[in-house]
Amino acid sequence: MLNSLQSGSRLRVDFSKIPQELDVPNLLQLQKSSYENFLMADSKSRENSGIEKVFRSVFPIHDPHNRISLEYAGSEIIKPKYTVRECMERGITYSVSLKMNIRLILWERDEKSGEKTGVKDVKEQSIYVRDIPYMTDRTSFIINGVERVVVNQLHRSPGVIFKEEEASTSSGTMIHTAQIIPDRGAWLYFEYDPKDILYVRINKRRKIPSTILFRALGYSKLDILKLFYPITKIIIKENKFFIEFRPEDFIGRVEFDVRDENGNLIVEAGKRLTKKKAQKLIEEGVKYIEFPLDVLMDRHLASPIIDQESGEVLYDTLTQLDEHKLKKILELGIDEFEIVNDIASGKDRAIINSFIADQESLKLLKQTEGIEDENDLAAIRIYKVMRPGEPVTKETAKAFIQQLFFDPERYDITRVGRMKMNHKLGLDVPEYVTVLTSEDIIKTVQYLIKVKNGQGHIDDRDHLGNRRIRAIGELLANELHSGLVKMQKAIRDKMSTISGSLDELMPHDLINSKMITNTILEFFATGQLSQFMDQTNPLSEITHKRRLSALGEGGLVKERAGFEVRDVHPTHYGRICPIETPEGQNIGLINTLSTYAKVNELGFIEAAYKVVKDGKITDEIVYLTAAQEEGKIIAPANTEIIDGNEIKGDYVEARKDGEIILVEKNKVELIDLTPRMVVGVAASLIPFLEHDDANRALMGSNMQRQAVPLLRTEAPIVGTGMEKVVARDAWESIRARRSGVVEKIDSENIYILGEDENGAYIDHYRLQKNLRTNQNTCFTQKPIVKKGQFVEAGQVITDGPNMDHAELALGKNMLVAFMPWNGYNFEDAIVVSERILRDDEFTSVHIYEKEIEARELKHGVEEITRDIPNVKEEEIEHLDESGIVKIGTYVKPGMILVGKVSPKGEVRPSPEERLLRAIFGEKAGHVVNKSLYCPQSMEGVVVDVKIFTKKGYDKDPRAIKAYEEEKERLSKEHHDKLLMIDREEMLKIISLLSKEPLEKDAKIKDKEFKAGEKISKEELSQINRFALNALVKSYAPEVQKKYNAIKTHFQNEKRKLTEEHEEKLAILEKEDILPSGVVKLVKVFIATKRKLKVGDKMAGRHGNKGIVSVIVPEIDMPYTKDGRIVDIVLNPLGVPSRMNIGQILEVHLGLIGKKLGEQIQEIFEAKRADFVKELRQKMIEIADVAKLMNAKETIEKMSDEELIEYARDWSKGVKFATPVFEGVTAEEFEKLYELAKMDLDGKTELYDGRTGEKFKERVTVGYMYMLKLHHLVDEKVHARSTGPYSLVTQQPVGGKALFGGQRFGEMEVWALEAHGAAHTLKEMLTIKSDDVEGRVAAYKAITKGEPIPQPGIPETLFVLTKELQSLGIDVEILDEVKDDEETGTN
């Protein structure tokens, strides 16, 4: 059982009601395993990797003239040259190089026939394909220095799907359709039309009768009829028509009166023919029954009727019978004929109607093409629909159809599609056949006819059995395949054009890998599924990597996606989170995997269940897909259980195919693993989620992803137990690779010394400090282990941003009161105490990057220098001798960060100037100041500077100094590792020798030892290693052997460390890669502190968001009886209508945690003699409220030091975990209230801070976990005086990024009109907008202190006239109105 008090490196009281038997699987497993299966970079045998399969699907490539072939012989992957960090700093892609080995075969061939006769020559060559972006250990990609994530795509699974949808032509009419969806290739649609004709469409082209497709596949008319209809033999006796009596033809009610050969009525029309009665009739000898004439009239012939005498075909197959034709048949004296029985159960006239519909078009084609064979004509008809206007022969048409569905290069339904088709249509085609077969097409249509006639099952396209996940590996394989197909075409073209001798030809002459390069680069750089990684905090990063998008190539388009696709489906249970999805137009199209969900190798999502047998829960855990779950009866996780594993009661509420039913407990087959399996990671971090409305929970889970990392982190008092899981799987924390003891530790390094079966080893972990993330938040790691502490493998040893003791910590625990406060918390606004600012509670650090390039220009090279023309000395005193700002400088807007001068264009100097230059030398006047200045909205401390210099150019002193410092750091690191490994070696050797007796006499310094004596550790430690080498010879051979083994192991370890060090130095020595034309690149990183301000957005975890409206002095805030001042005042009206009651319960539990923490603090402060015993008792008493935990046992086993450490943490507030759907119950609340000595209503008397008067009503006060979101007012507020204007309209541009103006819209105009502010309005619409001349005149008038002149004509008017003129309408603007007389009007 995994439920324990331990959470990260602290204790947390867990209120789970169900024992947790399975740990949450690694949250990033899907991405990791998918990419690993694609590349298999670390495997020795890579034959099964996705990349190998792609290459094999395209090769071999043959020359159309049978002269040469290209074969694929394997691929090779070369590891990355740079580390992840360096790629980010240098702005390059973190990638592996891919090489493929290609074999070129030259063939001997017969000159006459052109056939191959034997191999002439074979050449093999390794060809570099391209660099493929390589997944970092944090499951992201570095593309051009930017960290990106490839989101998993949720798309329609290949296979066959049957639907019922509304006809586009006539409203209300439902039509039935079948679709065969491939992964690659032409889509095939079969659809009924309102006239009951079955049509087929290929790739949404014009529809054609389905029988044309069957004929093109080679079926004759009779074959098709036999495939779709029972053929009934009509026997003629005494001018009456009879059929053989078969009871199975009369399922359900009988359509017509059934009479025997003598005309006796057996079954009346509309009655049922039971099995019993049918059997009785057979026993009575009824063999034939009369076929009514009126029913026979509308039937069609299944075989032609031939005149026996002349041999002439009177009536062809499918001729519709009528009175005249039947008379003729009787006259001819024919005994029997066959009809198509289209009135049999489950049949309709669709195929017959299709035959009738296709007759006209085939007749026309017969005349135009001059071909008699209808099958060839059908193929030509399809070709003409697919490629209209192109010339066609019957061979081309047949080959085209063959390519369309039966060619593996053009068509692929994948293993998944084949499996689904076999399952749906009852086929047993082998899984490796991933093209269509004729049988697939026939069976699809047969099933569609059944569906139309109420016998088949309509599919639900939103069922997760019909949707699958394409993860990074598959998406990349598809891109690679499309690139290779383009390359294959180019190679074939090249092969066919090669002439002359082929002896000198090499594989690289044929292969152009640029096509592959372009497709892969496009996918990563601009693809819809390759996204800029959300790095605001660890949670946002993890959920971004677990995201499932229905958009992207081959997916849905958000503008066209309907409501059904977006809705929550019963099969989402345990697979896709029903809560976490964006608000807005992407709602429901972008989802997240549930906590325990896994994705199987076919891409279907699996949910975890425990098996139930005979009403007893077993320990067996199974993962099922939505399709496997069909028909299963599943009990919920919170079903009551007795005796540890038996379901209580005789009946239980359970789910079956999305319906809730009441069943006997013995019929239950499965039970949910845990209630948490329903929701995703972000939603499972919301305590008391079960008490929140889904809309607000959605906002809550989305807003947690926007929480900014704070300066000081603090884990929530009220958590859910998922905090440790997120911290465990986020790359921001460092986990120990192997177990061992912390040997050395500082703020930047952790060294762990351990031992395994191979001997001792040392693991070094480098901590990251002050790094900028994608969202400009600050990323810093800090150690949470101590020197000498033993660390398990996989244990978290450092906290990242938003982490506290290996738990996720997104915000702060704040004392909150729900009450109005002078109208300042109207409409969700938040009133905040000044204490929060003073104590830096919600202060965050943001790092911004500014960069500048020095380029090679036509007339010289730009230079980064301190020597800038026309700049005062005091403006550059913070720059070093290279002209770059010093680290630690506090910069303000307008300050120079990097000095840069650019040469002016060549100006011919005057003779005087030339003379002066000759005397005084070149002067600095021919350069322009192009320095990098600190932008307007930025202020902060320079935390880092990176300088990159192109090969062949001198490095400046600053770059040389940075290089020397890094080299020194690497050397110190290497030296420390060697020292530790040396010390461990000596300890091992001394330990070995001190236990063994001497075999010969030995002497250490002046002391002699006789054979058989043992030398103590103290004496051995006095000797140096050279003396030890001599001393070992006095020991037995076995001891010497062990000694040599130890020496060898440690020498190998040291060699490994040295190789590692040399590798790092080699990378450091590498030249910088810069874009062409760039000589030097300088990046400056500025850290800005952002305190909480009025206008910042804050939120709780329950979707309760608001804007800080006022920051109140601490003394004015409400306070409790015991003098506790409230931190935040929230509006109580934000709770009832939003229905997120979880926040109230959180506040109560938070206050309980704090009060219990104070009780522990009192024990510390009292310092009684047996205070440890008292602490232990208190902690057991608190933890015992949660039933499931073995708290007493755990706490009693703890050492005093451990206990005091955990109690110190609890003294700031006892930490609780209330998991979703199994949180704290009312009874547990009562016990906790009692322990915390609180009132049962959870309310408190509050006093007004300004007057000291008590508020009339008692107020809900408690601790809520509040987050500061990344919508910061500092980054949003912006003002413009004058600035850029739009080119066409001449109106100011919009937005902060462009330094734009505020839009004065329609409603603002109404506001000015309402106030009668005519002049202000005129000003707004002219000189402040697009009156070009007017604004220039106004500017002049203001500078000269003159009155502002009348506005001119707005540019909009000129734009309008130009647009009208472009339509051919002559428009003139008249400067003044002429007199009426002159214009000729009265």
Curated annotation (Swiss-Prot):
Which Pfam families does this entry report, sorted A to Z? RNA_pol_Rpb2_1, RNA_pol_Rpb2_2, RNA_pol_Rpb2_3, RNA_pol_Rpb2_45, RNA_pol_Rpb2_6, RNA_pol_Rpb2_7
Q: Which UniProt keywords apply?
A: DNA-directed RNA polymerase, Nucleotidyltransferase, Transcription, Transferase
Q: Identify the CDD domains for this entry.
A: RNA_pol_B_RPB2 (cd00653)
Q: What is its EC number?
A: 2.7.7.6
**In which family does this protein belong, per the annotation?**
Belongs to the RNA polymerase beta chain family.
Could you tell me which PANTHER family the record lists for this protein?
Answer: DNA-DIRECTED RNA POLYMERASE I SUBUNIT 2
Q: What's this chain's function?
A: DNA-dependent RNA polymerase catalyzes the transcription of DNA into RNA using the four ribonucleoside triphosphates as substrates.
Summarize subunit and interaction data from the UniProt record for this chain: The RNAP catalytic core consists of 2 alpha, 1 beta, 1 beta' and 1 omega subunit. When a sigma factor is associated with the core the holoenzyme is formed, which can initiate transcription.
Protein name as annotated: DNA-directed RNA polymerase subunit beta
